[in-house]
């Protein structure tokens, strides 16, 4: 089992808030575009409520921080397009390899 280093854990905690903020900004932009459509107000309201309920479950919005889950969390953030693989370039090579294995099923 892969052990997350203290420096990777610290870096993850420093980065996650910014990544989530950027992702939520993209969501808000999508909501604004959607709300600007010509659909009926009731249709927009209920569709928006459905979108928000779904989006709240995305790790780009809500994530429980556990040191042991960092490789899996990074993979989930990549798979849900919250971040790109390049965004984890500051992390250790070992962690990048672990995430690469989870996301792509192979080592670098």
What feature does the model see in each segment?
Residues 1-108:
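Acidic, Ser/Pro/Thr-rich low-complexity regulatory regions
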């Amino acid at each position: 089992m892969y052990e997350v280093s203290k420096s990777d854990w610290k870096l993850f905690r420093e980065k996650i808030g910014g990544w989530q903020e950027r992702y939520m900004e993209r969501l808000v932009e999508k909501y604004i575009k959607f709300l600007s459509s010509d659909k009926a107000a009731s249709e927009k309201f209920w569709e928006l409520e459905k979108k928000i309920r779904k989006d709240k479950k995305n790790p780009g919005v809500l994530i429980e921080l556990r040191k042991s889950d960092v490789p899996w969390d990074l993979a989930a953030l990549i798979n849900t397009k919250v971040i790109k693989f390049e965004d984890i370039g500051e992390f250790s090579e070992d962690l990048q390899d672990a995430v690469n294995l989870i996301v792509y099923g192979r080592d670098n």
